[in-house]
Amino acid sequence: MNFFYYKDFYQLSEISVGQHYYWQISNFQVHGQTLMTSWFVISLIMIIAFLSNLNMKKIPLAKSFQNLAEFVTEFILDLARTQVGKEDYLNWVPFLGAVFLFIFVSNWGGALLPWKLLELPNGELAAPTNDINTTVALALLTSFSYFYAGISKKGISYFGRYVQPTPFLLPINVLEDFTKPLSLSFRLFGNLLADELVIAVLVSLVPLFVPVPLMLLGLFTSAIQALVFSTLAGAYIGESVEDHH
């Protein structure tokens, strides 16, 4: 072990909060590092999906992409059925599956891949979900989805839910629609940022074996955050399409 060995560990432990590598697109500035890692995550999901459909067998091998894909599909089907309801869940399996897989792969990619070794002119590469803009976009997409679900099924009568069970609850029910995307986005962003900060501090202090258990715990909490987000998204859609009496 020499100086350069420890230097690599300290480089991994560095974290730049609030610094971004900007791309200028027309009159807009966008976070370039977030777009790059988002494209990487989407490409990885598409590659695994493609490999899962090659040489499909009636009984897949235990260690195969097909077996993994079937397990994930069954999990998402069960999640959608439980949260949305048996009548409407099939329409929302693609959306909930896309949200869950994007967040899950993003979170695990941020925990497992040494993004910080790839240098940028400013800022650093990190999981897409480590950017508040990504989590807010996912939360707003969820909000639009449950509005669409309710209006497409019930029409204008969907808005009757705001005065149920009593008209006095109208302000609270309206406020709830604003707090849902806020809680979704800040919960996901805050948990991931806190996990990365804790691990970065511990790696800088004790760069060898002590942070490993926390990194494993980070993988677990990252998976839980993907599950929580997609479960709440399904629950909100389920509330929109259920019949109120």
Swiss-Prot record:
Q: Which UniProt keywords apply?
A: ATP synthesis, CF(0), Chloroplast, Hydrogen ion transport, Ion transport, Membrane, Plastid, Thylakoid, Transmembrane, Transmembrane helix, Transport
Cellular location(s)? Plastid, Chloroplast thylakoid membrane
What molecular functions are annotated in GO for this chain? Answer: proton-transporting ATP synthase activity, rotational mechanism
The protein's predominant localisation is plastid
Cellular component annotations (GO), alphabetically ordered: chloroplast thylakoid membrane; plasma membrane; proton-transporting ATP synthase complex
User: Which superkingdom heads the taxonomic lineage of this protein's source?
Assistant: Eukaryota
What Gene3D superfamilies is this protein classified in? ATP synthase, F0 complex, subunit A
So where does this one cross the membrane?
Answer: 34-54, 93-113, 132-152, 197-217, 218-238
Q: How does it sit in the membrane?
A: Multi-pass membrane protein
The UniProt entry's sequence similarity note says:
Belongs to the ATPase A chain family.
Q: How does it assemble?
A: F-type ATPases have 2 components, CF(1) - the catalytic core - and CF(0) - the membrane proton channel. CF(1) has five subunits: alpha(3), beta(3), gamma(1), delta(1), epsilon(1). CF(0) has four main subunits: a, b, b' and c.
Briefly, what is this protein's role? Key component of the proton channel; it plays a direct role in the translocation of protons across the membrane.
Which protein is depicted? ATP synthase subunit a, chloroplastic
